[in-house]
Amino acid sequence: MRHPLVIGNWKLNGSKHMVSNFIISLRNQLSNMINCCNVAIAPPMIYLDRAKSYLTGSHIALGAQNVDLHVSGAFTGEISAKMLKDIGAKYIIIGHIERRLYHKESNEDIANKFACLKNEGLIPVLCIGETKEENEKDQTKAICVRQLDYILNIVGTQAFKNAVIAYEPIWAIATGKSANPLQIQKIHKFIRSYLFNHDQAIAEQVIIQYGGSVNASNAAELFNQPDVDGALVGGASLKADIFATIIKAAARAKKN
């Protein structure tokens, strides 16, 4: 049985004050939810150490929003997988459209980042998804396959053991417009079926999250879909009470 996973991607938001207040509040609101749902937050890199200190003793994990391809060296401004492991991060987001678009990261770059994370025993959270134009041309499945194939060809099927896939239709990210839950289920089922053709056991255990304007109002309906194993939450993860509501919705849906 797959355990639901909800991750908060803070993107370029936060402060020392926010980190401490947010985590204290979230811990209080989730105090009776031990082992009901896996939870992580991914603040900006500069706040990882502070977040880790406030997360200590809780079941909330630390995530990060990016990783570099290199272990060490003259790469100004970058963070390696080894460093993320050293600071206590567990879930590392890669392939997000904002990285693909603004930093020109290719599918090959993302596959190599995936490999770096696996080599350090960290859990990649691989973001895949299509643009509005690709969706309108009914190319969603083909785009998802292309993005998955880079991982399968470079790293191999076994790399998806203890990994996470986040289906994030690009047209739904930070727009307030979430995809229809039945459409989401259809794509999640397709992704799982595609992996099933490579390895049945891995397909059945891999966590497939949804990302794209997830909020307190639509979370319950999303999580009621059998192949939606959680969410990668953006803006709604910046307020502890809203994020807690989403987490509780995941726990309730997957408990039934």
UniProtKB/Swiss-Prot annotation:
Alphabetical GO biological process terms: gluconeogenesis; glyceraldehyde-3-phosphate biosynthetic process; glycerol catabolic process; glycolytic process
Location, primary (coarse class): cytoplasm
Annotated keywords: Cytoplasm, Gluconeogenesis, Glycolysis, Isomerase
GO MF term list: triose-phosphate isomerase activity
Cellular component, GO, one term: cytosol
Enzyme Commission identifier(s): 5.3.1.1
Cellular localization per UniProt: Cytoplasm
Broad enzyme group: isomerase
Pathway terms, separated by semicolons: Carbohydrate biosynthesis; gluconeogenesis; Carbohydrate degradation; glycolysis; D-glyceraldehyde 3-phosphate from glycerone phosphate: step 1/1
UniProt record similarity statement: Belongs to the triosephosphate isomerase family.
HAMAP family tied to this protein: TIM_B
Chain's role: Involved in the gluconeogenesis. Catalyzes stereospecifically the conversion of dihydroxyacetone phosphate (DHAP) to D-glyceraldehyde-3-phosphate (G3P).
This protein's name: Triosephosphate isomerase
Protein source organism: Baumannia cicadellinicola subsp. Homalodisca coagulata
Lineage, uppermost ranks: Bacteria, Pseudomonadati, Pseudomonadota, Gammaproteobacteria, Candidatus Palibaumannia
